[in-house]
Regions:
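Flavin (primarily FAD) cofactor-binding/catalytic cores of flavoenzymes
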Residues: 1-52, 59, 95-289
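A catalytic-pocket lid/entrance helix-loop region that shapes and gates access to the active site
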Residues: 55-97
Length: 289
């Protein structure tokens, strides 16, 4: 019954045409923040709807505290080029990562305390992961629940982008009604509610039976939210043989695609050339979705 326009974040292109209009963006992670910033810069009246807590990491702080020793001009001067940095980063055991990451995010809390205080004052729901291990572990465990801040957090903190937390009750002709009865007028609703799973794409490209055979992709089996156990020891079904012969999964960030694509290519080439490629036994499938 909504009389305005609705789009998923994947279909949003620009805020140019929404100058002076009311726009509600449902979501509070990377896509939602980027879209809110674009809409605000183009003169829209923007409200972000946050339904659950989000981890915020300032880009500059993240690069300095977490990645500066590997990916920076200083690292290059120390002889650490991109290939070496990728190898070092990939060599860290996933089991050891949380203990290594927690102190980094404690430093981040101190350095950016003013931003976090202003966000919380604005009503923003913050978290640093279930165990305080921050962005990287959220990324590896679930691939969601965070925003790398390149400016939009300031817009939320000072109220230029309005914020409403809570669940949505329903959509009406001229906007959204929240569970607490608050009504948000909207000419446009952007649903920044995430993307489908890799399993979902397998089901679309092949069939559901194949998707179920491969099982859940991504995540470590940490037992945290959206990453059910048991512990896997490595990312589920990524860059290695799966339960479906000749179906390989490739994904992740730039570092992972640079580093692991070579290993996938070598495995494929070996099979084409008939070179034996003994590996550990195929991982058991514990989750279908």
């Amino acid at each position: 019954s909504f009389k305005g326009q609705q789009v998923h974040s994947s279909a949003f292109r620009t805020g140019v045409e929404w100058k002076g209009k009311n726009v509600v963006v449902v979501g509070s992670n990377n896509s939602a923040h980027d879209i809110c910033a674009d809409l605000w810069e183009n003169g829209a009246n923007v409200t972000m709807v946050q339904r659950s807590s989000t981890h915020i990491a300032r880009s500059d702080t993240l690069m300095d505290l977490a990645l500066g020793g590997l990916y920076s001009e200083a690292a290059v001067k120390n002889g650490v080029d991109t290939d070496k940095a990728d190898l070092i980063f990939a060599s860290l055991p996933y089991k050891a990562l949380p203990a290594l990451q927690i102190p980094v995010y404690e430093q981040m809390k101190e350095r950016d305390a003013d931003l976090y205080a202003r966000l919380e004052k604005a009503g923003f729901l913050l978290d640093f992961g279930e165990d305080g291990s921050g962005l990287f572990m959220k990324y590896l465990r679930r691939g969601s629940g965070y925003y790398i801040d390149v400016g939009a957090s300031e817009l939320v903190a000072d109220g230029r982008v309005k914020l409403k937390t809570g669940s949505i009750e329903h959509v009406e002709a001229d906007g959204l009604v929240m569970a607490d009865g608050t009504k948000l007028k909207a000419d446009l609703i952007v649903w920044a509610t995430g993307y489908g799973s890799m399993n979902g794409w397998i089901a679309k490209l092949v069939d559901q039976a194949t998707a179920d055979k491969v099982g859940k992709c991504w995540g470590l089996g940490s037992g945290t939210n959206k990453d059910p156990g048991p512990w896997e020891g490595e990312l589920r079904n990524m860059w290695k043989p799966t339960q479906q012969p000749n179906l390989w999964m490739q994904g992740g960030n730039l570092h992972q695609n640079r580093h692991y694509s070579l290993l996938v290519a070598l495995q494929l080439k070996a099979r084409m050339e008939g070179v034996p490629t003994p590996v550990y036994a195929l991982a058991a499938v514990h989750h279908k979705a």
